[in-house]
């Protein structure tokens, strides 16, 4: 490109203190070439199933699908329809060059944020852009990116190989036929594995619950008319996912509340859901009971269970009505783990066939609840900092609050948890850098020795994720 201008510091995420910075570089150099293990994320498998697939325009790649970008721009008054997001009640901008220009004019908003760091990394290291994006060079950079995206070497499959991804797990609805994964496996492309995500049918207040139940019925070829047949359907689909290479499930809820209902109680709630006449409290009780059922099934089939809790979805109802979900309007909640998980752990917490990875948005629970739980129960692992805390400072807070009680070997390593495929290397790079800098700090303070630091760096970068998700 034109004027050479470095936009990424080689010392990013590292301490300014010389001894710690030197050690951080040494640790990072020792693990930077390790393959990427991506055990949880939201990449569309269709991108990889079709050898001819391309990403489309720069706007389609970087802006339209990224709710991190949408929420920041919306917070500063940029209408979502101006960013190409379809709405139910107004025209939507279709000129992708115009959308990119608007994005570039507001690129300064991402200064100091994880999104800004990822975007700079993607533009620099994936696409070779050697100047900072701004309103003046937006058109030129758009043309440059558009040209690259048309080339075979920038296809999703080519970048998958270039990124050195060892395994990538998608997140798929319980009713998904997994045809994309099947076609990939038939080609010998077995690095792509599904993950069983039943939220759309087990959370009775999920948008479109009845329609999603119909899809589940279609996937098993029969009617679901009772709670008993519903549970049978979930068990069958889990078996299908496992046959297709899945090693894990994932379930999200506002809180990690768990409870055991009798068959009669569960049947009564499900019957009310079928006719659309739920009572107050039914949703929480049923979700809490299904967490217990998912744990039981995990003991039986060996799939790792993941729980993502602590977010209020669609906090902005007006935005949801116009644009739908996943547009940046989800907000963290304060939650409680110790009492909520007690029924589940009383039943399964000591069962060596059970493995539970927990993710939370309430950082106040890291040292008070999450780390002590993982530091005691042999079945629990802590997931990495999630969503709003997937950042340099968020990772540092996580390490400092979790590791004293749980150690690193009761954690699940890192997962990128992203829809943005080209951001995967950048996200892993930040995690590895922050981890190495934190470890270097431990060494300089005499808390671990240098040899232990190298071992821990490898574990955090690679080994822990493979082991946690049974990808060995």
From Swiss-Prot:
Transmembrane segments: none annotated. It catalyses: D-glucuronate = D-fructuronate; aldehydo-D-galacturonate = keto-D-tagaturonate. Coiled coil: none annotated. Pathway: Carbohydrate metabolism; pentose and glucuronate interconversion. GO terms for molecular function: glucuronate isomerase activity. Its EC number is 5.3.1.12. GO terms for biological process: D-galacturonate catabolic process; D-glucuronate catabolic process. It comes from the Bacteria. InterPro entries: Metal_Hydrolase, Uronate_isomerase. Keywords: Isomerase. NCBIfam families: PRK02925.1. Belongs to the metallo-dependent hydrolases superfamily. Uronate isomerase family. PANTHER family: URONATE ISOMERASE. This is Uronate isomerase. The lineage of its organism: Bacteria, Bacillati, Cyanobacteriota, Cyanophyceae, Nostocales.
């Amino acid at each position: 490109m034109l004027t050479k201008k470095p936009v990424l510091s080689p010392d990013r995420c590292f301490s300014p203190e010389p001894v710690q910075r030197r050690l951080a570089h040494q640790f990072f150099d020792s693990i930077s070439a390790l393959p990427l293990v991506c055990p949880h994320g939201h990449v569309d498998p269709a991108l990889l199933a079709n050898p001819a697939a391309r990403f489309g325009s720069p706007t389609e790649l970087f802006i339209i699908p990224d709710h991190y970008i949408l929420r920041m721009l919306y917070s500063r008054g940029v209408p979502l329809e101006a960013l190409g997001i379809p709405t139910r009640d107004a025209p939507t901008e279709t000129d992708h060059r115009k959308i990119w220009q608007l994005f570039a004019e507001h690129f300064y908003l991402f200064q100091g944020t994880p999104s800004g760091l990822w975007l700079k990394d993607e533009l620099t290291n994936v696409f070779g852009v050697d100047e900072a994006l701004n309103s003046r060079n937006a058109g030129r950079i758009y043309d440059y990116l558009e040209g690259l995206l048309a080339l075979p070497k920038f296809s999703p499959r080519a970048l998958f190989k270039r990124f050195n991804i060892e395994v990538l797990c998608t997140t798929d609805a319980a009713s998904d036929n997994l045809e994309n994964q099947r076609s990939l496996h038939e080609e010998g492309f077995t690095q792509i594995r599904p993950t069983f995500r039943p939220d759309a049918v087990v959370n009775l207040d999920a948008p479109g619950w009845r329609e999603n139940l119909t899809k589940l019925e279609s996937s098993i070829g029969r009617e679901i008319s009772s709670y008993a047949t519903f549970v049978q359907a979930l068990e069958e689909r889990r078996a299908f996912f496992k046959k297709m290479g899945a090693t894990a499930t994932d379930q999200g809820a506002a809180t990690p509340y768990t409870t055991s209902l009798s068959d009669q109680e569960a049947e009564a709630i499900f019957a009310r859901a079928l006719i659309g006449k739920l009572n107050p409290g039914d949703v929480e009780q049923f979700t809490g009971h299904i967490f217990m059922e998912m744990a039981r099934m995990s003991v039986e089939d060996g799939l790792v269970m993941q729980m993502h809790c602590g977010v209020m979805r669609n906090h902005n109802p007006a935005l949801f009505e116009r644009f739908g979900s996943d547009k940046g309007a989800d907000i963290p909640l304060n939650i409680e783990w110790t009492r909520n998980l007690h029924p589940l752990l009383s039943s399964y917490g000591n069962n060596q066939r059970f493995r539970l990875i927990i993710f939370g948005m309430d950082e106040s629970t890291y040292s008070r609840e999450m780390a002590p739980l993982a530091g005691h129960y042999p079945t629990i692992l802590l997931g990495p900092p999630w969503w709003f805390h997937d950042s340099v400072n968020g990772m540092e807070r996580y390490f400092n609050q979790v590791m004293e009680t749980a150690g690193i070997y009761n954690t699940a390593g890192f997962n990128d948890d992203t829809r943005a495929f080209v951001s995967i290397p950048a996200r892993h790079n930040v995690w590895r850098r922050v981890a190495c800098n934190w470890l270097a700090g431990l060494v300089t303070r005499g808390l671990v020795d240098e040899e232990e630091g190298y071992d821990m760096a490898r574990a955090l970068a690679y080994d822990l994720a493979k082991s946690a998700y049974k990808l060995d």
